[in-house]
From Swiss-Prot:
Consists of an N-terminal domain, which is sufficient for the localization to the septal ring and is required for cell division, followed by a linker domain, and a C-terminal domain, which forms the translocation motor involved in chromosome segregation. The C-terminal domain can be further subdivided into alpha, beta and gamma subdomains. The alpha and beta subdomains form the DNA pump, and the gamma subdomain is a regulatory subdomain. It is found in: Cell membrane. This is DNA translocase FtsK. Residues 464-660 form the FtsK domain. GO terms for cellular component: plasma membrane. ATP binds at residues 484-489. The gene is ftsK. The lineage of its organism: Bacteria, Bacillati, Bacillota, Bacilli, Lactobacillales.
Length: 801
């Protein structure tokens, strides 16, 4: 019996089969899955203390993404076999989830309350607070796992960069989860865009056909109605019983019918240089009233000034800029200018009739049905207004500019498609002879308001109307054009127009002329703040003086309680009327730069900064700028300058690139020169073509001598830029420091103190740009403070402190 028991104990155990082992594993996995699912369900529903605590423990790991995490884990527990069959599905979900953790944590640490906290400690503190209090209230981002991922990413790419990195993770995860790759997505997007474009085009064609059907139906109904009215009219006519004829003038009826059948001939408007048109301003009466309000008599702003809280004006207001009044000053008259000779452009009419036929035949040869409705003969170009037939695309006509120039044997053709405010297309063709528009002729026809001191007659439009603009509305003007295009003549015309209307105590000029020949004639007139600046190095300092004056004026306005120069001068007038102690009104200031490109080569940073500040703030202070350049490239007219000088005047340029730099569109490359311009004011979407006025050097000298005979120049020392030397620091082509940097000693002391030398250290410690830091390194090497560069090795410091 004992032996049998021993034999029974020593018998080997039966080995389980593979199927039995797999079954046991499946049972264990099922039990664990069910237990895990129950745990997750308790956590998701937050049932009792156990559920809240479990949920907070999961939040400690993945933060506020606990619900998506638990939901994904439940799917994995019961569908893991199916998920394993999908290539990349699990990896894609994990990578996308990590991206979401980074996004959630970046959002958490973008909150103001988390900006200065440590990433790990701040996250743990938020979660622990809820965990101990048995609650779920705080937003905890991506939990500790999110903090672990976010910290290095934020260190390398900042908080904003973390959003992009997280988005890339999510995008990569989506690509892994789906069978698509980047090429499939791009192909899908391209096909979708193509389908939308085709559908849009088909819908557009259907709408066009429907409109045409409605139009034809309306025409048919109109013809039927006209036929019925004609039958009714014939039925009511009186018939002579003897002759059987209708008692009506049949001859006139026949001639009327023939006139109806004959094609209407285009209207041709000849250019008359002495025709005085009432429409003499580029702006309507409302705009002129606004300009009058801003700069003229200041009547409309008196109510605004009186509505402000009255301030104590007994104390004298200190004004740095106090020009003298000129009580006996007389304004120049137009008689100073030589009368212009009448222009004979009679032969242009015959040429226009011929060109109308050529235009229609040329369009017909290209299969385009058009009709010339009107032709306006201007001083330099003739504008043909054509009406295309229904269904003709505008760009088909615009693309024929070169073909039209060939057919008309013209120098160039400019197409305005369409004309603003009209359902017509304008074709501008140069005249065989250009009629010069004199300054006197333009002044006599402009009817400019004498109270608007900065309203300037600019030129004549294609229809011969004199056009003017108010610099106070612009409020700054950019003038650009190649040599010989009429840019300097236009600037002289603007200056002369202001001198014709303003006394020295009303308007002051600061003129900058690096070429030294364009504006020097205005030296010693009483309107100048300082003599004409010809040194480019002084120009930047002079512009800075104007910036300082602008700031002083704003401080003065703030102290008085007014918003602009008009309100201040109104307050001064009211104070002077009621007090024996007189205050001096502030004059307007016009800054004129004749060649901006030369200034930008010498001191680009200082000049650009001053121009930008004046462009942004100077209008209310009564300061306006006119910037002229013959090289309209992007390195001269930067984007910031263009943004702050909204009004543009473009003369003939050499390329379409220059035209786009000035006007943001083509057109200036097709101008003829000699005063032919495109003017685009601040409140116009499209430029207006004008023929600028011509003012000779003799005319300028006469008006300058007339002014000099009445008053002497009274320069203001507050605007004097002082003397500058050739080695003056701070002036170089790129706006950095020139040779002999004033920070050399400070950089040397820094290197000797730290016994380290690198451009990045100097850039960081001295707050300078990289270019200036490298130049300081070169100067330190030349002075023997540091050794030469040795590849990637740090430089040796050769001196000690």
């Amino acid at each position: 019996m004992v032996k049998r028991n021993q034999r029974k104990k020593s018998a080997p155990k039966k080995r389980l089969t593979k199927a039995e082992v797999e079954k046991q594993r499946a049972i264990k996995r099922m039990i664990l899955s069910v237990l895990m699912a129950l745990l997750l369900i308790f956590a998701m529903l937050r049932l009792g203390v156990f559920g809240v605590t479990t949920y907070n423990m999961i939040r400690f790991l993945v933060g506020s993404l606990a619900y998506p995490f638990m939901f994904a884990w439940l799917i994995y527990l019961f569908c893991f076999k199916w998920l394993r069959q999908k290539d990349g599905m699990i990896a894609g979900v994990v990578i996308a989830f990590l991206g979401l953790l980074v996004e959630w944590h970046a959002f958490l640490f973008a909150m103001p309350r988390m900006l200065d906290q440590d990433i790990f400690l701040g996250t743990a503190r938020l979660i622990t607070r809820d965990l101990l209090a048995l609650r779920v209230t705080e937003f905890v981002g991506g939990g500790m796992l999110g903090a672990l991922l976010y910290k290095p990413i934020a260190f390398l790419f900042s908080n904003i960069g973390s959003y992009f990195i997280g988005f890339l993770f999510i995008l990569l995860g989506l690509f892994l989860m789906t069978p698509w790759d980047i090429y499939d997505v791009s192909h899908f997007v391209k096909e979708a865009v193509d389908k939308l474009a085709v559908a849009y085009q088909e819908n557009k064609e259907k709408r066009f056909i429907k409109r045409e059907e409605h139009r034809l139906q309306a025409e048919k109904e109109a013809l039927e109605k006209q036929a019925q009215e004609e039958e009714k009219r014939l039925a009511e006519l009186t018939v002579d019983p003897e002759t059987g004829e209708i008692v009506e003038d049949s001859q006139s009826q026949v001639s009327y019918d023939l006139a109806e059948d004959m094609p209407k001939e285009p209207e041709i408007l000849a250019y008359d240089s002495h025709l005085k048109d009432d429409e003499a301003s580029l702006f309507d009466q409302e705009d002129l009233a606004y300009a009058h309000e801003e700069i003229g008599a200041y009547d409309s702003l008196s109510a605004l000034a009186s509505s402000e809280d009255e301030m104590d004006m007994d104390e004298p207001v200190e004004v740095d800029f106090t020009p003298k009044t000129h009580l006996l000053y007389k304004l120049p008259t137009i008689d100073l200018f030589v009368p212009d000779k009448p222009k004979n452009q009679s032969k242009e009419k015959n040429l226009v009739r011929k060109n109308i036929k050529v235009l229609e035949d040329t369009f017909q040869s290209f299969g385009i049905d058009v009709k010339v409705e009107r032709a306006e003969i201007g001083p330099s170009v003739t504008k043909y207004e054509i009406k295309p037939a229904v269904g003709v695309r505008v760009n088909r006509i615009s693309n024929l500019a070169d073909d039209l120039a060939l057919a008309l044997a013209a120098k160039d053709v400019r197409i305005e498609a369409p004309i603003p405010g009209k359902s017509l297309i304008g074709i501008e063709v140069p005249n065989s002879e250009i009629a010069t528009v004199s300054f006197r002729e333009l002044w006599e026809q402009s009817d400019a308001n004498p109270e608007n001191l900065l309203e300037v007659p600019l030129g004549k439009a294609v229809n011969g109307n004199a056009r003017s603009f108010n610099l106070a509305r612009m409020p700054h003007l950019l003038v650009a054009g190649s040599t010989g295009s009429g840019k300097s003549v236009a600037v002289n015309g603007i200056i002369s127009s202001i001198l014709m209307k303003a006394r020295p105590d009303q308007v002051k000029f600061m003129m900058i002329d690096p070429k030294m020949v364009e504006l020097s004639v205005y030296n010693d007139i009483p309107h100048l703040l300082i003599p004409v600046v010809t040194n480019p190095r002084k120009a930047s300092k002079a512009l800075q003086k104007v910036v300082d004056e602008m700031e002083n004026r704003y401080e003065l306005f703030s102290k008085i309680g007014v918003r602009n120069i008009a309100g201040y001068n109104t307050k001064v007038e009211e104070f002077n009327a009621s007090s024996e102690q007189k205050q001096i009104p502030l004059p307007l200031i016009v800054v004129i730069v004749d060649e901006l490109a030369d200034l930008m080569m010498v001191a680009s940073k200082e000049v650009e900064d001053a121009i930008i500040r004046l462009g942004q703030k100077a209008r209310a202070a009564g300061i306006h700028m006119i910037l002229a350049t013959q090289r309209p490239s992007v390195d001269v007219i930067s984007g910031l300058i263009k943004a702050n000088v909204p009004s543009r005047m473009a003369f003939a340029v050499s390329s379409g690139t220059d035209s786009r730099t000035i006007l943001d569109e083509n057109g200036a490359e097709k101008l003829l020169g000699r005063g032919d311009m495109l003017f685009k004011p601040i409140d116009e979407n499209h430029p207006v073509r004008l023929q600028g006025s011509f003012i000779s050097d003799d005319d300028v000298e006469r008006i300058v001598n007339f002014i000099k005979d009445q008053a002497e120049a009274d320069y203001d020392d507050a605007f004097d830029p002082g003397e500058v030397s050739d080695n003056d620091p701070g002036f170089s082509g790129n706006g950095g420091a020139a040779e002999g940097d004033p920070l050399f000693e400070e950089a040397k002391a820094l290197v000797l103190e730290t016994q380290k030398a690198s451009a990045s250290m100097i850039q960081r410690r001295l707050s300078v740009g990289f270019n200036r830091a490298t130049r300081l390194m070169d100067e330190l090497e030349e002075a023997g403070v540091i050794g030469p560069a040795e590849g990637t090795k740090p430089r040796k410091v050769l001196q000690t402190n």
